[in-house]
Design a protein with these regions (language model features):
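Conserved alpha-helical segments that form or flank metal/cofactor-binding pockets of metalloenzymes
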Residues: 44-83
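Helix-loop segments that flank and shape redox-cofactor active sites
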Residues: 6-14, 29-54, 121-133
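Long, contiguous binding/interaction regions
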Residues: 2, 45, 57, 77-85, ...
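Acidic/histidine-rich alpha-helical segments that form the ligand environment
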Residues: 68, 82-140
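Short amphipathic alpha-helical segments with heptad-repeat character
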Residues: 13-23, 27, 53-56, 60, ...
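Disorder-to-helix initiation segments
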Residues: 1-22, 96, 100, 104
């Protein structure tokens, strides 16, 4: 069945590529957040353990939305660790132990990187590729990451 949504294949393909890069970033951030949930230590253990859980649960929802947006545009979502590792713009957290404060700082840096990428890619998606729907979707994701970044910054003050 052909897709007929007033977006040519030449408009949709680059947008699907943007979504798959974003999906790789979301997966990387999800895994890092989950890692920190498992490995946080210190006086704030209980609070941060729950905080990281809340964040990775939201990231799980966001990953699903990104993948489904790619499918809605008749594309395919990346689905392997190799694809995610090759496409992500974030750095993985290594197994080395880091302080709770460093965990928060790393997550904040990643959310801020995603926000910067989303801001640029939302504009590109709308202006260059004519996809107002995905532009709006990316702005919504940016707002979710801005809220998570704000919460991380609040812990670091």
């Amino acid at each position: 069945v052909n897709i007929d949504i007033s977006l040519a294949d030449s408009q949709r393909r680059p947008v699907i590529d943007i979504l798959n890069r974003l999906l790789a970033d979301e997966v990387t951030l999800y895994v890092k957040t989950r890692n920190f949930h498992w490995n946080v230590e210190g006086a704030d253990f209980s609070e941060l353990h729950k905080f990281f859980e809340d964040q990775y649960e939201l990231l799980d929802e966001l990953m699903d939305q990104v993948a489904e947006r790619a499918r809605a545009l008749d594309g395919y979502a990346a689905g392997s660790l190799g694809e995610f590792a090759a496409a992500t713009r974030l750095k993985e957290a290594k197994g080395a132990r880091v302080s709770a404060k460093e965990m928060l700082a790393q997550l904040l840096a990643d959310h801020q990187a995603i926000i910067r990428n989303l801001r640029a890619e939302a504009a590109e998606t709308g202006e260059k590729h004519g996809d107002a729907g995905t532009e709006d979707f990316l702005v919504g994701l940016m707002e979710e990451h801005e809220k998570m970044a704000w919460m991380l910054r609040a812990y670091l003050k």
